[in-house]
Amino acid sequence: MSTSENESLDELSYARLVGERLRQIRQQKKLSLSDVESATNQEFKASVMGAYERGERMISVPRLERLANFYGVTVDQL
């Protein structure tokens, strides 16, 4: 495997882990994806949140910080 392939796998694994954690926290808060979209004035669209949670999309650090703030957790908890 090439270095770029390893990096892609690492990014994919990271995206999945963060996504799983995002879903766990959202569900602990008893929020639907639509609830998050509404409560954030559509900053976090339900479709995009779903992609983050499935690990299909990488979330940027600034967005991760805003989402952690919304959920009332630290970035480390995500």
What name fits each language-model region?
Residues 21, 25, 39-40, 70-73:
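Generic non-transmembrane alpha-helical segments
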Residues 20, 46, 61-64:
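Short alpha-helical elements of helix-turn-helix
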Residues 2-29:
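A short, Lys/Arg-rich alpha-helix, primarily the initiator
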Residues 62-77:
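DNA major-groove recognition helix of helix-turn-helix/homeodomain DNA-binding modules
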Residues 54:
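Short, conserved catalytic or interaction motifs in soluble domains
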Residues 29-51:
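Short alpha-helical DNA-recognition segment
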